[in-house]
Design a protein with these regions (language model features):
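Intrinsically disordered, low-complexity, charged/polar segments
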Residues: 48-173
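Broad, structure-driven detector of short, well-ordered beta-strand segments within folded domains
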Residues: 25-26, 197-206, 214
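Negatively charged, low-complexity tracts enriched in Asp/Glu with abundant Ser/Thr
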Residues: 174-200
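Acidic, aromatic-enriched beta-alpha/helix-loop junctions
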Residues: 36-81, 205-246
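Short, compact, well-ordered microdomains
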Residues: 239-269
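Short N-terminal edge-element motif at the start of the domain
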Residues: 1-46
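Short beta-strand segments
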Residues: 23-25, 212, 250
Length: 269
């Protein structure tokens, strides 16, 4: 017989990061506005595997993000596990968090059909357990709020991904306005193809800052750029932060990036 899984508001869970560290999140509410899904708050910080937290002290930590998820799936798959509980839910802070969604279709009463629309012009927002508010285009009030986040019900994979890296690899419309920020210790590798310029970019970030970049030109040459060698043959190292390009880039492995870098290091045109 399958083990009965019981979760209660206040429960605290641990996510093992796979690099000798672990992090924590707490189940703090159910959101009737979003399918009565579980709302969690993930805490800033990673801890050695032998660390034994004081739960009442842990919940006083800075909140990294809020999210909706299905706790049971993560528990059944051993993606997180319960380690304790606390009555401190931080609900005053949750009340100020904005959840964001967007619509790609809207109902047209004249035709009794749904019309396709631009999601970038049809955002809606809400606070936990409050009505959704259509806002049209994204506004500074929402995008610049410190706790604005994707309001979808996230899979266990997306929850763990964001806890581990500080961001998710999902391509979200929201990311055009709310920049993703990796943890300072995270190394990220991304690639992006500029169809207009016919240039393929490969990026290596340390935290939010660019470390290395490889550009494949339209004629098949490769340009290696770095902090120590930021300009070459009319090309310059990317000067923005991670969040400036993460919404339109695909992840690649560090192994693939380094293979490309090493293959063309010192051989640029």
């Amino acid at each position: 017989m399958a083990k009965r899984i019981v979760t209660r508001i206040g429960d605290i869970f641990c996510v093992e990061l796979g690099d000798g560290y672990k992090s924590y999140f707490q189940y703090i509410a159910n959101d009737m506005t979003q399918l009565n899904s579980s709302v969690i708050r993930a805490f800033v910080g990673r801890y050695p595997m032998d660390y034994q937290p004081d739960m009442d002290e842990l919940v006083k930590s800075e909140v990294a993000f809020y999210a909706h998820t299905v706790l049971r799936i993560g528990l059944v798959g051993d993606h997180w596990y319960k380690v304790g509980k606390s009555k401190d839910l931080g609900l005053d802070e949750l009340a100020s968090a904005w959840f964001v969604g967007e619509s790609s279709t809207v109902y047209n009463p004249e035709t009794d059909k749904f019309d396709d629309v631009d999601p970038l012009e049809h955002f809606y927002v809400w606070h936990c357990n409050e009505s959704q508010i259509p806002i049209g285009k994204m506004t500074p009030e929402i995008s610049e709020s410190p706790m604005t986040t994707n309001g979808s019900v996230l899979s266990w994979f997306r929850i763990v991904e964001r806890i581990k890296y500080g961001y998710t690899s999902a391509d979200l419309y929201l990311n055009r306005y709310v920049k993703q920020k990796p943890w300072p210790w995270v190394e990220s590798y991304l690639t992006y193809f500029d169809r207009m310029a016919r240039l393929r970019y490969y990026f290596h970030f340390k935290g939010e800052k660019i470390s290395r970049e490889v550009i494949r030109t339209s004629d098949g040459n490769f340009i290696n750029l770095s902090e120590n060698d930021p300009e070459k043959d009319g090309y310059a190292l990317f000067t923005g932060s991670f969040g400036d390009i993460s919404w339109c880039a695909w992840n690649v492995t560090g192994e693939k990036f380094n293979t490309i870098w090493d293959k063309h290091h010192g051989k640029e045109s």
